[in-house]
């Protein structure tokens, strides 16, 4: 294993990678320009100062500063993008090969989508790049030393007890350390008036630190944070709010923001869209598209991969293969490659069979020489020139068990009013969903999408209005976001699914579990021993086997790989019942829905068409609304608002004005006649 020396990595909790972790300093305001370099004027005053208590602190301050400057002096600018190459990487766990001679690279301007089924070794490759794991063999080759690497893992972490601004400030560990030391040096210089030698050393350190502060642009930190907070959707008032008061989606924005603030040389993203709403995903796409920094993105969000990636690296059965273009181009190229390889394999198999047949016919008598020649040809075909049959994952078809047809009316929402103490979510909202409709509920995080599903399921009660399930044979099957944590921890994996299944053969249940990446040795494992992702996949399997006429799904694709998503999409399209889903996966929504409901401004905006129809009409509606507002504002008279008057008051005022007008006319006429006769 060869790693370029002096690799400078970053580790912001789970967000960044640091070789030496520094405790996040206490937030304080420090402006470099406000700190003047103390003049080297030494007054002729002898002050008796006890240095015993401060000597060790000063020595520590001086030595630390020297180390800090020394450590950073050789760093390249973080704006200079570079790349990394994995060369013949192999990795095994407990005798099971996960990666086998994996080779690929990412360079400046490239955005690599790393894809594969769950457990294929995608995250392992990122961990090898960052040095968190060592490969069994192979090399990681860096294009330059001191490369700054940012890594957003699936399990992001933020400090719940900090404010939003404090959380972002923790990104600037070195800068805050410099600011703290500058402040301490300023105080030390003021106290060292009787020690010329010490003051000289302190001033030298101050000069070094001040230059370093200018290099890291210490003055701009607050402006950078404010700008990015705005881009991420935070308002200025959010800066002093606790991180704990935000939803997981907003906490993910904080983690992303901490990465983006560092301007890394290499950006590694592991499922970055998992907790983001559609608006934020589109913002993130727009932001990342503009960056030249090399990126490696693990994602099962096919629309995200389509928008961003310049090439796709597929890991299958431990082997990697690189395809130019985005995800859609990969799908086409992969199909063509498999087809061509299968045709070549089939042709070679026919040649092998024909050669074997020739050998058997020539083996006897005078043709033994020709038979020997044919045997050599066969040996060469089978050993040196053998074409492997292309691997094709077995496509398992799943169907949701159905219980006949429901009545025409499935869900009715009438004048719904609902909210929480600090926020009203729905204000006289109305909705009617009928049998056979497949509906997507969309909107920004926190607008009430999941709450609407809970109201439909009867898990929440309206403040006013009503939410009614149809009377005839409406049998809902509900998949909620935290369903993974609501399972019986004492049951085994197989017991959990068998309990929910009706009329399923045990072999079919095992096949379903296998398709969701539960190996045979995991079937008897207790649920309590599963990871978060494994619990989520188990909850999905349990959901798939329950009979119903109405599917209610809250972010069902969050922990699914692409083949599992395709399996779910096919099952939903074959389902004759009604489907209501909350999802931020645009590709998934496009495949399954025929109606879109947008939660906006306390109401439910209805788009009677698929997701493309919603995009078309939504843009037009927003544009028309803006045009109307601009037109009304332009035509509106620039006067103060009139006070409210009754009809009788308005009539009286009108008569009064008319009398005043008539009197004014008479007065004007008399005045003119008087002037005329004078």
UniProtKB/Swiss-Prot annotation:
Q: Where is the composition biased (Basic residues)?
A: 653-678
SS bond partners: none
Instruction: Return the annotated region ranges for Disordered.
Output: 630-678
> Among its keywords, does the record have Isomerase?
no
Keywords of the record, alphabetical order, are: ATP-binding, Nucleotide-binding, Repeat, Transport
Instruction: Show the InterPro entries listed in the entry.
Output: AAA+_ATPase, ABC_tran_Xtn, ABC_transporter-like_ATP-bd, ABC_transporter-like_CS, ABCF_ATPase, P-loop_NTPase
Entry superkingdom: Eukaryota
Per its UniProt record, what SMART domains does this chain match?
AAA
Protein family (similarity comment): Belongs to the ABC transporter superfamily. ABCF family. EF3 (TC 3.A.1.121) subfamily.
Q: What's the protein name? A: ABC transporter F family member 2
Gene name in the database record: ABCF2
